[in-house]
């Protein structure tokens, strides 16, 4: 099967044109680990390169022979270079400004570094701006850091009409004072539709040096920690023992990177959970028995104990006592029935649970066990139990004492009948006090399978009892698989990305329009669409400021579907009726930053509030985020702007670890979160 991908190619004239070339499908029906990779490719903006005829370009500095126009001459062997000489070179930031002479619907930029084997001037941190008049530039439409190599770099962003484009080089990849560009192109969308009011907004884009296939929020800093594999663009053929990571700091906008070797663990396709002490436990994947621990307070990676069973594509979940349960994972480490095991943070050991059988939770995937035990929807619950909500039709209770056990919880069904398997769908606990879980999307088989619009509400009771399951609204607006989702402070669930037919490493049949499920109304609402494909290997996380971080996709080496970026979605609750950012309530004081389950917290705010919630810090990979869950809080008004609330007394509801505390005013506008650690 062949698909068409639009690429911008530079010819020998000054004019760059867009041509369409066939692209061989990658990954279709082929296990990931068997692929061989050649060179990095990145996903270009959806659209075409704009003709560079009649452009006028200016730059802040240029070396004689390397003038500004050398970056638009269609010759990859020439390049613009800032001035260098014996008397001190001008330091960054350096700017390159394009006047296209006419207004275009701009949605991206490509930058080819110099191709002569010299790294001088390679751009690291950067920002991209648009303007209609060349004077008013506003805030960046994209910013971040590019990987330091000679491949073409892209900044993809939401379409905006503009005549002027400016690239600002903030740093040089090797810390030198120069900037150089061999070729620069600007991309246009076929049309422009302004975002509709009341449906949230996308942007800006964060350019990354890696494809973020896995991520977590660092609870003590609020930074987004991301990683790919042993390479920034590929996972196949790994030598093991190495992982490329990046982090983005929302407070500064700075993207940094780190190569992790201390844990001797390629952490691609892992299980991820934040344990009861707040350490992020990363298990298996390319190095299928390994465990790596990330400690946010010290910003350090720590080697953990090997698992009893080698695993990849397994899920894991933190339990009521702070331990971590994992099961399945036949993508790597051998294909056989991989029963449960438990990690103890106190003893730093894994213990097998031979009677916590994986067989009851298997799907009927046409690729067999290699796929059927992947990405379980796991929820730590009361009394050390773990509820498995899917993706199989069968639901189960897992028990973690002694040798473990498993008991059927029935099937995921409603008055519309028994739901099929929903591999690579999502499950979100949006009200942990009431045991409410929203499940949606997915497909019967992992790949080459049509997605579903099915959505269900599962209500948990005591461990071992059959949960109540009903159909949610009329289901999703859009069938999707390989999508992602987060629970929001107000209890709604934001759903984005995915494909109508699941094909790994293909950007075909993408879903661009997100949805929000509002449980009080039992209704899904469409939101403003984005323009960057987010499918296989994409991630989403809730930020402490109430926005959504959504990025990644690809990691397939010699392909054109690698997405080295993320976007921010700002939900409508952060805007007022005029479409401007609303004034937020602020938490000015908390009586404690650490509380035992059942304990009370008193807070002070700068204004009146009406609601509050706790949301556990999230981790995400391969459609799975078992850490996030929401607790709606009952507030007591102590007078003035002082309020108190009680944390639920059951640690199966209020799992130990780090939580985000949000307060909301009568208009539903949330605060920036304060971090609360819940202990046993």
Swiss-Prot record:
UniProt GO molecular function = galactose oxidase activity; metal ion binding
Q: Where is the signal peptide?
A: 1-24
Q: Taxonomic classification, please?
A: Eukaryota, Fungi, Dikarya, Ascomycota, Pezizomycotina
Q: Does the keyword Signal apply?
A: yes
Give the gene name: GAOA
Spell out the post-translational modification annotation for this entry. Answer: Galactose oxidase contains a protein-derived free radical cofactor. In the active state, Tyr-313, which is cross-linked to Cys-269 via a thioether bond, is oxidized to a radical and acts with Cu(2+) as a two-electron acceptor in the oxidation reaction. The cross-link is believed to modulate the redox potential of the tyrosyl radical, which is further stabilized by a stacking interaction with Trp-331 in the active site. The post-translational formation of the cross-link is closely linked to the propeptide cleavage event, and both are copper-dependent, autocatalytic processes.
> What enzyme category does the UniProt record give?
oxidoreductase
* UniProt cross-references to InterPro entries, sorted A to Z: FA58C, Gal_Oxase/kelch_b-propeller, Gal_Oxidase_central_sf, Galactose-bd-like_sf, GO-like_E_set, Ig-like_fold, Ig_E-set, Kelch_1
Active site per database record: 536
- Its main subcellular localisation, reduced to a broad class, is secreted
Query: Is Metal-binding set as a keyword in this record?
Result: yes
> Which compartments does it reside in?
Secreted
Which sequence ranges form a coiled-coil region, renumbered to this chain? none
Q: How is its activity regulated?
A: Inhibited by diethyldithiocarbamate.
The consequence of residue 535 to A is:
Improves catalytic efficiency 1.3- to 1.8-fold. Improves catalytic efficiency 2- to 3-fold towards D-galactose and 1-methyl-alpha-D-galactopyranoside. Improves catalytic efficiency 4.9-fold towards 1-methyl-alpha-D-galactopyranoside
Give the protein name, as stated in the record.
Answer: Galactose oxidase
């Amino acid at each position: 099967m062949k698909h068409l991908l639009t690429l911008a190619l530079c010819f020998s004239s000054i004019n760059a044109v867009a041509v369409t070339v066939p692209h061989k499908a990658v990954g279709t029906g082929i296990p990931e680990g068997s692929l061989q990779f050649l060179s990095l490719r990145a996903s270009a903006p959806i659209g075409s390169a704009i003709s560079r005829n009649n452009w006028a370009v200016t730059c802040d500095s240029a070396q004689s022979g390397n003038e500004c126009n050398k970056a638009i001459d269609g010759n990859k062997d020439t390049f613009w270079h800032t001035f260098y000489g014996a008397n001190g070179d001008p330091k960054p930031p350096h700017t390159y400004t394009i006047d296209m002479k006419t207004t275009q619907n701009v949605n991206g930029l490509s930058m080819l570094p110099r191709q002569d084997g010299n790294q001088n001037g390679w751009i690291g941190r950067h920002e991209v701006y648009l303007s209609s008049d060349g004077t008013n530039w506003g805030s960046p439409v994209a910013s971040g850091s590019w990987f330091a190599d000679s491949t073409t770099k892209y900044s993809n962003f939401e379409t905006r009409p503009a005549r002027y484009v400016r690239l600002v080089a903030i740093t040089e990849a090797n810390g030198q004072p120069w900037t150089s560009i061999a070729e620069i192109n600007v991309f246009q969308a076929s049309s422009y539709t302004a975002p509709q009011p009341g449906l949230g907004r996308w942007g800006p884009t964060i350019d990354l040096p890696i494809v973020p296939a896995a991520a977590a929020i660092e609870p003590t800093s609020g930074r987004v920690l991301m990683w790919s594999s042993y390479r920034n663009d590929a996972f196949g053929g790994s030598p093991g023992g190495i992982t490329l990571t990046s982090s983005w700091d929302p407070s500064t906008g700075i993207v940094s990177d780190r190569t992790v070797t201390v844990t001797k663990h390629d952490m691609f396709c892992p299980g991820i959970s934040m344990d009861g002490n707040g350490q992020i436990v990363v298990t298996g994947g390319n190095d299928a028995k390994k465990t790596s621990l990330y400690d946010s307070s010290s910003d350090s990676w720590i080697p953990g104990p090997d698992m009893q069973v080698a695993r990849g594509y397994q899920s894991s979940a933190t339990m009521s006592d702070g331990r971590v349960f994992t099961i399945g994972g036949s993508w790597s480490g051998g294909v056989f029935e991989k029963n449960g095991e438990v990690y103890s943070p106190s003893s730093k050991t894994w213990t097998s649970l031979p009677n916590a059988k994986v067989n009851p939770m298997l799907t009927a995937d046409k690729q067999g066990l290699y796929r059927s035990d992947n990405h379980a929807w796991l929820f730590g619950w009361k009394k050390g139990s773990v509820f498995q909500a899917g993706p199989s039709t069968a639901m189960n209770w897992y028990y973690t004492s002694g040798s473990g056990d498993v008991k059927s919880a029935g099937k995921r069904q409603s008055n519309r009948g028994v739901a099929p398997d929903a591999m690579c769908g999502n499950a979100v606990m949006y009200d942990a006090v009431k045991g409410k879980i929203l499940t949606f999307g997915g497909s019967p088989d992992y790949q080459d399978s049509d997605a579903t619009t099915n959505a269900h509400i599962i209500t948990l009771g005591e461990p071992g009892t059959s949960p109540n399951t009903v159909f949610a609204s009329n289901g999703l607006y859009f069938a999707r698989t390989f999508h992602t989702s987060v629970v929001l402070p107000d209890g709604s669930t934001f759903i984005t990305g995915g494909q109508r037919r699941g094909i790994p490493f293909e950007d075909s049949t993408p879903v661009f329009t997100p949805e929000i499920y509002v449980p009080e109304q039992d209704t899904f609402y469409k939101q403003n669409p984005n323009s960057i494909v987010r499918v296989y290997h994409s991630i989403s996380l809730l930020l402490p400021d109430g926005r959504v971080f959504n990025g990644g996709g690809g990691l397939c080496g010699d392909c054109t579907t690698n997405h080295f970026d993320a976007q921010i979605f700002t939900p409508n609750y952060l805007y007022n009726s005029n479409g401007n950012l609303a004034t937020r309530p602020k938490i000015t004081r908390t009586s404690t930053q650490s509380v035992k389950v059942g304990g009370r917290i008193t807070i002070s705010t700068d204004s009146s509030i009406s609601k509050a919630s706790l949301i556990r810090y999230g981790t995400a990979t391969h459609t799975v985020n078992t850490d996030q869950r929401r607790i709606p809080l009952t507030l007591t008004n102590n007078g003035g702007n002082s309020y108190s609330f009680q944390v639920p007394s059951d640690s199966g509801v209020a799992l130990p670890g780090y939580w985000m505390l949000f307060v909301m005013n009568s208009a539903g506008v949330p605060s920036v979160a304060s971090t609360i650690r819940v202990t046993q």
